[in-house]
């Protein structure tokens, strides 16, 4: 599975030499500050500012502020920044990872859980590791086969795989040291289990920490801690109760059995589905408080009424939970969204910092989860200190000033009142996995925020889970956007993306940047008073951290959702970012996922420096013309086809049958022209190796055929609109939205 440095890779379109990131390679020399000792690694992360040339952990330091003191690249010269080179990836899906740099070597995880080890100065491939994740696992996760990053400790690099494994490899050679399956064979996890691992690994006190995802399908969340040297499980903490209130023989037994179970009750869909509460992103160790913080996700199913019969707050959904690192013992929790029914996870970034609160310096957690509120908590005790919405939201009338609990808008409790609810934020949140940053120079938190509304409506007839599909307890035909000019125009006006400079003391926006649309990348803050961010429209920017002035722009030719990072080798500063459009927004939202532009996926790692001379090759593949669809379709089965499509296909191939630039747009797929060919792909799994699973156990042949007929109708409905959007003499789109506007 490991390929040595002699293995060759093609660079982007064959322009650069194999495995090369730098147009003018520099000789590699080890930097003096080393981080490869058992005792040294944790101390090196704690004292990261003593050797800022490295980037040793997902957020650089345990505080996860994503701030680097490097200032060779600064406001005065960032306009001279150039592409130094790029390293092409062989996974053209979403790239969300933050590479690590340890003593001059870059460790970058990519889609499908692959690992690339590169010389950080030259881009030379040192080794790569492919864990061979099965293609049919792709539809077991909600949001693309992404990976957000690795951990490093004692000469080993660790990362999770989409199918649930944790791999430890020798950092120098790439040879596997150990690997474990992080998902136990335990019936208490729910009958319909669907676990994936895509979060960044964290390592602290010799423990490798990893969570998982899967609550959209059926899962019971937990976090595991493994010995970094041996891979032995040290402890496990479940985030929601055992459905029989029995011990799991885990660190969480006492708190779940004596407190959390009472907030659920003995009945409801959670008993079958597991309850959710997966920790798929933020998982943080704070050396100041000596605590581990779990950022806990949504319920399984989403629907509160169906999940627990509308009873209780459902601990620990939508919460931060603090544990003792050595044992996993519960210390405290704060639940931001009790009774969650909107997919308002709290898995978004947990950051610690010191700031004044009522005239006293406090060590705090700052947190901007999906629900649209910014929270400040005491890091040691979990005490709620302050909270305020950082964007517009309509589900709550504010927070209780003493407890931080939401004061609900009754109209927003759609699962209890049975009404349709146009929710802001929607399930993609006001802030998602895109990392925020903090600058100790400006004392501002920089949030990549967005607004993506959603239509919530109870599933008709109660909770009816489907195999091989999302099971959230909603009517999936009601969240689809009506294909009328009026509906599209109204919805598009409600889509927004921002970079917010937020004052955590005054709890207010100091300045903001309006982007062309939502789903933009994470933030890096530097000592040069700079912010770096990639955008959904394929631009990579540097902004003035003090006022948001746009100081630099680069056309990356693909949407960027990953956060940048920075490092130095031999005294020279670099900025790097993984490029590659993807994630749940473009794969599920259909045509409206193109509001920022036609952001096709071209995946690579880009490195920038002040003396860069590389250029990306001209890219001209955005102007394809749609294939004229078959003229005839069976109107009698189209409605059933729409239901089946929204149930099984929409979350990967786009709302209303429209793609958004990453996975195949099925309206123009050749297979829709032939019934047998379509069934061979959808029913028999002809493309399983590429991530398209088979559905013959979930749907009948007639239901699969109804989907084909629906897609033919959608192709006919939208063909001329898509062609008109591309009209010029070279058939290259002039309108970046490619026909999504009426």
Curated annotation (Swiss-Prot):
Q: Which UniProt keywords apply?
A: Calcium, Cell membrane, Disulfide bond, Electron transport, Heme, Iron, Membrane, Metal-binding, Oxidoreductase, PQQ, Respiratory chain, Signal, Transport
The Cytochrome c domain extends over 636-715
Report the InterPro entries cross-referenced here.
Cyt_c-like_dom (IPR009056), Cyt_c-like_dom_sf (IPR036909), PQQ_b-propeller_rpt (IPR018391), PQQ_MeOH/EtOH_DH (IPR017512), PQQ_rpt_dom (IPR002372), Quinoprotein_ADH-like_sf (IPR011047), Quinoprotein_DH_CS (IPR001479), TAT_signal (IPR006311)
Q: May I ask which residue range the UniProt record assigns to the signal sequence? A: 1-35
Q: How is the cofactor bound?
A: Binds 1 PQQ group per subunit.
Which cellular component terms (GO) are annotated to the entry?
Answer: outer membrane-bounded periplasmic space; plasma membrane
Q: Which reaction does it catalyse?
A: ethanol + a ubiquinone = a ubiquinol + acetaldehyde
- Localized where? Cell membrane
Residues that bind Ca(2+): 216, 298, 343
What membrane topology is given? Peripheral membrane protein
PROSITE patterns, per this entry?
BACTERIAL_PQQ_1 (PS00363), BACTERIAL_PQQ_2 (PS00364), CYTC (PS51007)
Q: Which cofactor does it need?
A: pyrroloquinoline quinone; Ca(2+); heme c
| Binding residue positions for pyrroloquinoline quinone | 96, 148, 278, 370, 584
One of the entry's Gene Ontology molecular-function terms is: calcium ion binding
E.C. no: 1.1.5.5
Cite the binding residues for heme c.
Answer: 649, 652-653, 692
Q: State where composition is biased (Basic and acidic residues).
A: 722-732
Annotated region (Disordered), positions in chain: 722-742
Query: Source organism's superkingdom?
Result: Bacteria
The record's top EC class is: oxidoreductase
Where's the active site on this chain?
Answer: 343
* Function recorded in the entry: Dehydrogenase component of the alcohol dehydrogenase multicomponent enzyme system which is involved in the production of acetic acid and in the ethanol oxidase respiratory chain. Quinohemoprotein alcohol dehydrogenase (ADH) catalyzes the oxidation of ethanol to acetaldehyde by transferring electrons to the ubiquinone embedded in the membrane phospholipids. The electrons transfer from ethanol to membranous ubiquinone occurs from pyrroloquinoline quinone (PQQ) to one heme c in subunit I (AdhA), and finally to two heme c in subunit II (AdhB).
Q: How does it assemble?
A: The alcohol dehydrogenase multicomponent enzyme system is composed of a dehydrogenase subunit I (AdhA) and a cytochrome c subunit II (AdhB).
Q: Which family does it belong to?
A: Belongs to the bacterial PQQ dehydrogenase family.
State the name under which the record lists this protein.
Alcohol dehydrogenase (quinone), dehydrogenase subunit
Q: Which organism is it from?
A: Acetobacter aceti
Q: What gene name is given for the protein in this entry?
A: adhA
């Amino acid at each position: 599975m490991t390929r040595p440095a002699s293995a060759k890779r093609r660079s982007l379109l064959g322009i650069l030499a194999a495995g090369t990131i730098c147009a003018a390679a520099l000789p590699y020399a080890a930097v003096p500050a080393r981080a490869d000792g058992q005792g040294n690694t944790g101390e090196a992360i704690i004292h990261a500012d003593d050797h800022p040339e490295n980037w040793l952990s997902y957020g650089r330091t345990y505080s996860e502020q994503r701030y680097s003191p490097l200032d060779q690249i600064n406001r005065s010269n960032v306009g001279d920044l150039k592409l130094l080179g790029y390293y092409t990836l062989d996974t053209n899906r979403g790239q969300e990872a933050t590479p690590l740099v340890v003593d001059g070597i870059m460790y970058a995880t990519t889609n499908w859980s692959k690992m690339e080890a590169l010389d950080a100065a030259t881009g030379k491939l040192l080794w790569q590791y492919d864990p061979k994740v099965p293609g049919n696992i792709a539809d077991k996760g909600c949001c693309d086969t992404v990976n957000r990053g690795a951990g490093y400790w004692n000469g080993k690099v660790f990362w999770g795989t989409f199918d649930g494994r944790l791999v430890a490899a020798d950092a120098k050679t790439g040879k596997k040291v150990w690997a474990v399956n992080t998902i136990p064979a335990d019936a208490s996890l729910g009958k319909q289990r669907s676990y994936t691992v895509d979060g960044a690994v964290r390592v602290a006190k010799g423990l490798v920490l990893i969570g998982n995802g899967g609550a959209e399908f059926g899962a019971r969340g937990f976090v595991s801690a493994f010995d970094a040297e041996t891979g032995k499980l040290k402890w496990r903490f479940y985030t929601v109760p055992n459905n029989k209130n029995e011990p799991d023989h885990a660190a969480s037994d006492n708190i779940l059995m004596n407190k959390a179970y009472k907030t659920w009750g003995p009945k409801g869909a959670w008993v079958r589905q597991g309850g959710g509460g997966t920790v798929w992103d933020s998982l943080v160790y704070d050396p100041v408080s000596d605590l581990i913080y779990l950022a806990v996700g949504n319920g399984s199913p989403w629907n509160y009424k169906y999940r627990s019969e509308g009873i209780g707050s459902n601990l620990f959904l939508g919460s931060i939970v603090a544990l003792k690192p050595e044992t996993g013992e519960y210390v405290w929790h704060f639940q931001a969204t009790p009774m969650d029914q909107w997919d308002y996870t709290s898995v978004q970034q947990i950051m610690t910092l010191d700031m004044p609160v009522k005239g006293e310096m406090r060590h705090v957690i700052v947190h901007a989860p999906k629900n649209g509120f910014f929270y400040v908590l005491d890091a040691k005790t979990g005490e709620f200190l302050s909270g305020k919405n950082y964007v517009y939201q309509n589900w709550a009338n504010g927070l209780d000033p003493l407890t931080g609990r939401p004061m609900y808008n009754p109209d927003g409790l759609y699962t209890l009142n049975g009404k349709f609810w146009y929710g802001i934020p929607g399930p993609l949140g006001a802030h998602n996995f895109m990392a925020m940053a903090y600058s100790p120079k400006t004392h501002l938190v920089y949030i990549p925020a967005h607004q993506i509304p959603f239509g919530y409506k109870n599933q008709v007839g109660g909770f009816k889970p489907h195999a091989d599909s999302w099971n959230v307890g909603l009517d999936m035909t009601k969240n689809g956007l009506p294909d009328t000019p009026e509906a599209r125009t109204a919805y598009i006006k409600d889509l927004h993306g921002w970079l917010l400079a937020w004052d955590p003391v005054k709890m207010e926006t100091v300045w903001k940047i309006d982007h062309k649309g939502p789903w933009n990348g994470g933030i890096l803050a530097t000592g040069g008073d700079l912010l770096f961010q990639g955008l959904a429209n394929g631009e990579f920017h540097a902004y003035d951290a003090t006022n948001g002035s746009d100081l630099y722009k680069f056309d990356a030719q693909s949407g960027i959702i990953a956060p940048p990072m920075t490092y130095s080798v031999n005294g020279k500063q670099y900025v790097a970012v993984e490029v590659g459009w993807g994630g749940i927004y473009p794969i599920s939202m259909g045509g409206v996922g193109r509001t920022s532009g036609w952001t096709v996926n071209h995946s690579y790692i880009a490195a920038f420096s002040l003396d860069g001379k590389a250029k990306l090759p001209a890219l001209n593949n955005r102007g394809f013309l749609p294939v004229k669809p078959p003229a005839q379709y069976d109107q009698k089965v189209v409605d059933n086809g729409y239901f089946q499509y929204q149930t099984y296909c929409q979350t990967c191939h786009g709302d209303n049958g429209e793609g958004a630039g990453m996975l195949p747009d099925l309206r123009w797929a050749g297979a829709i022209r032939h019934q047998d060919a379509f069934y061979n792909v959808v029913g028999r799994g002809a493309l399983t190796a590429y991530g398209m699973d088979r559905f013959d156990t979930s749907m009948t042949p007639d239901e699969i055929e109804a989907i084909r007929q629906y897609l033919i109708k959608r192709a006919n409905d939208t063909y001329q609109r898509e062609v008109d959007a591309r009209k010029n003499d070279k058939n290259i789109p002039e309108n970046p939205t490619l026909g999504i506007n009426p």
